[in-house]
């Protein structure tokens, strides 16, 4: 019994290895679980839903169809899923509202699917939506009556969220609320009473009642025209008469409320600074999580820095909208902004820093990312070069007089001994009071690393930027309480249709396995199988053909390979430059600069180090030859390398290409389907190519059986370590240097590189060989 259980466990762990992200090794500690309110685990109650005779869910009794249902754009299922008609004339009024209150599940061309979750409703309240607003507008937009279970779920999740705020004013912390009864309820708790600041005589300080005037720190531009974002603006205007009056007037009212200067009466009490963490934990336990807001305009303790946006920096409508969610009430809210790769996340970060105008810390996940952030600050803002300091293993600028510091997660989270110079910089970083911390590629960092980084540096406001808020584990939800709720998420197809990102043709190229390679693939059970389907000669030929085809069109091509053995083999045989983990920073920058500006260098090979933070706007073709199992995030990040809008291209035509080369009848095909899920949900479609036209006419490598046999021998001679994925040193979530792996007896005897080969001797050769043998040895042959 025990042996069977063990084998089952091993099978499961082997399966998970490929599906999980690189960072999944870290286990969330018990302490991180404390910071999640009980309401976050609640689900929509579906117990009242009946099934019809065919086993399908029957919603007819719970949801009554409205008379004017054809002019309403959506319906809400009792399980919390919301279905929106993208072709409806009312689409533009519903799109922004649904993004604010729910999580996008799938957004193809004609119908979009969203899901109400506790976290999405928490985010909605945090950006200013009230419980009554959410329910009322949902009822106005719905084709049917909204199920009672959904109304109860919305009330349950939003009744206490957003009611209490932790505000920093004049370097003093206050718990603030517009609801006096909530403040009184909190003060009845003994732990919170202990956190309250007392006067010199030991008496509690008085409650402060004041009227706050708030207005968005980001004003609307003329090009936005005050309307919601839409992929079909003309349709909405043309069909304006079909919009029901109640939907139109209610949207206008909500939009007006968001932009108008508001006066709110608040009640607050001051908190002892050393008790902040204790207070936050206790408020979460009482189901009143504190929203962190930074009143940066009234912060007189931290000096303003001399930094503004350049006149040439023009924000696009969706960038403005995301920033208005962050600065909606004149204060800076902490949270996450989700924009596609190439849609200008860096400009959003720089604009946020210029709006706050306090000391800013930027964290990326590689030294290349640090250099690019520095270039972005110099490009979009008026900041002086001397005010920017970098802190990486290669570049440690002196932090004296620095206003913007740029570093990596691994540099700040480093726990072992540092050099004297690095220790001094770290002490300086810890001593600073940062106004804003920008966390780039925020999805890649495990919870433990976050806690380490966020406890090392003190920041009033945290802004997370990412293109893919997905992970194969459930750790993505930790971002809600470690940083803040999701403030804004853009629609990829909408940005593509408006020309803000490239129009990409996605294709999956099926490469048949050669008979010799497939025979070995079926026989071998170790990780060397990965090498066999990656080094498949037909895949190599397809890659070579696509490179030649696109180079003739003067395209810029990036080839991605997670496996270093395959990366080197492909690049060296095709005589192309390649970048992987051990490549020095200087060599990387030289290769990337040549790729950008040298017309003779049109193709580069990159390992997984280029998945994120490599800014290559010139690239318009991406070929993927090997990948990290079934990781949806990696597929989307790689597509992002070619998503940047192309200059001088016609928007109606495809102007970027994404090829994923897959060996047929292997495990790679299953992984490929899993990887595409996120992009398919965003509205992309993958074209399957089984035969590349014109490939037979080309003179390609490995066209003969002998060449293929030699390649097979080289692959079989490789060790199991060559089949391992690349471990990127210094990268957050990198796997340890040792690992258990299945081996063979030949490995134990040191015969890993030895090959057994049979040769057929021609007939009569024995006799001819015998003639040349010395008579002395002939006696021993008898």
Curated annotation (Swiss-Prot):
Ranges of Basic and acidic residues composition bias in the record: 1-11
Subcellular location: Nucleus
Keyword annotations from UniProtKB, A to Z: ATP-binding, DNA damage, DNA repair, DNA-binding, Helicase, Hydrolase, Isomerase, Nucleotide-binding, Nucleus, Transcription, Transcription regulation
All residue ranges annotated as the Helicase C-terminal domain in the record: 541-701
Subunit note: Component of the 7-subunit TFIIH core complex composed of XPB/ERCC3, XPD/ERCC2, GTF2H1, GTF2H2, GTF2H3, GTF2H4 and GTF2H5, which is active in NER. The core complex associates with the 3-subunit CDK-activating kinase (CAK) module composed of CCNH/cyclin H, CDK7 and MNAT1 to form the 10-subunit holoenzyme (holo-TFIIH) active in transcription. Interacts with PUF60. Interacts with ATF7IP. Interacts with Epstein-Barr virus EBNA2.
Stretches assigned to the Helicase ATP-binding domain: 326-487
Top-level taxon of the source organism: Eukaryota
InterPro entries referenced in this protein's UniProt entry, alphabetically: ATP-dep_DNA_Helicase, ERCC3_RAD25_C, Helicase/UvrB_N, Helicase_ATP-bd, Helicase_C-like, P-loop_NTPase, XPB/Ssl2, XPB/Ssl2_N
Residue stretches of biased makeup (Low complexity): 211-223
Keyword match Oxidoreductase: no
Documented EC number(s): 5.6.2.4
UniProt protein name: General transcription and DNA repair factor IIH helicase/translocase subunit XPB
Record's GO cellular component terms: nucleotide-excision repair factor 3 complex; transcription factor TFIIH holo complex; transcription preinitiation complex
Annotated residues for binding of ATP: 339-346
Reaction catalysis annotation: Couples ATP hydrolysis with the unwinding of duplex DNA by translocating in the 3'-5' direction; ATP + H2O = ADP + phosphate + H(+)
Family membership noted in the UniProt record: Belongs to the helicase family. RAD25/XPB subfamily.
Cross-referenced Pfam families: ERCC3_RAD25_C, Helicase_C_3, ResIII
Function noted in UniProt: ATP-dependent 3'-5' DNA helicase/translocase; binds dsDNA rather than ssDNA, unzipping it in a translocase rather than classical helicase activity. Component of the general transcription and DNA repair factor IIH (TFIIH) core complex. When complexed to CDK-activating kinase (CAK), involved in RNA transcription by RNA polymerase II. The ATPase activity of XPB/ERCC3, but not its helicase activity, is required for DNA opening; it may wrap around the damaged DNA wedging it open, causing localized melting and twisting that allows XPD/ERCC2 helicase to anchor.
Nucleus is among the record's keywords: yes
Segments for region (Disordered): 1-47, 211-242
Biased composition (Acidic residues): 19-28
